[in-house]
Amino acid sequence: MARGRKLTMSQSERYLGSSYSYGDSNGNSATDESELTEEDIWSHAVDHSPEMLESHGAWNTRDAVVRNGRVGGGLSLAFEDASSSPRIVHQIRGGGEGGGGGGGGGRVERQLASSAPVNVPDWSKIYRVNSVESIHESDEEEEEDSGMMMPPHEYLAKSQQRRSRKSGGGGSVFEGVGRTLKGRELRRVRDAIWSQTGFYG
């Protein structure tokens, strides 16, 4: 700070506005009308019933407002739709304060998270493909050394060899390539190798 200057506004006034001060409830009426208070925002959503207050008399922020059998609070009250279907509300037995079962205050309504039933299609029947279990069984039958790990390019090469043995094809990398491996022919061989090993350039 510069030596010759006085700080004319406190930090709270600088950040929160000039009409704000701690503990000053007798502020200027013109500025008080333009300022929002907590009651302006939360008065319609707050239900000051005795059930909503804790035993200490303080507001319990975890409890929500119960309206029309639904539990909600905050923005959910602003977007409340009367035409929406009712939700399942589970009743939970709470440990009553003061011991005995008198007064009927042991039941507390709270809405638990639940999802709507979802129809999950069976894609194996739709696309008529083998199930995952049958694919794994066929892999186990064909693979001689099931305990060893192998790199992906070797795995693909072995699976290609198995396919070519079953189909009766030759062991050549690319069928029909001429003698010379110059220029275009070399590119075709390279692309064929990449397509069969799974590494595309």
From Swiss-Prot:
<protein>
    <recommendedName>
        <fullName>Protein S40-5</fullName>
    </recommendedName>
</protein>
<dbReference type="GO" id="GO:0005737">
    <property type="term" value="C:cytoplasm"/>
</dbReference>
<dbReference type="GO" id="GO:0009751">
    <property type="term" value="P:response to salicylic acid"/>
</dbReference>
<feature type="region of interest" description="Disordered">
    <location>
        <begin position="1"/>
        <end position="39"/>
    </location>
</feature>
<feature type="compositionally biased region" description="Low complexity">
    <location>
        <begin position="17"/>
        <end position="29"/>
    </location>
</feature>
<keyword id="KW-0963">Cytoplasm</keyword>
<dbReference type="GO" id="GO:0010150">
    <property type="term" value="P:leaf senescence"/>
</dbReference>
<dbReference type="GO" id="GO:0009737">
    <property type="term" value="P:response to abscisic acid"/>
</dbReference>
<dbReference type="Pfam" id="PF04520">
    <property type="entry name" value="Senescence_reg"/>
</dbReference>
<comment type="similarity">
    <text>Belongs to the senescence regulator S40 family.</text>
</comment>
<dbReference type="InterPro" id="IPR007608">
    <property type="entry name" value="Senescence_reg_S40"/>
</dbReference>
<feature type="region of interest" description="Disordered">
    <location>
        <begin position="134"/>
        <end position="178"/>
    </location>
</feature>
<dbReference type="GO" id="GO:0009646">
    <property type="term" value="P:response to absence of light"/>
</dbReference>
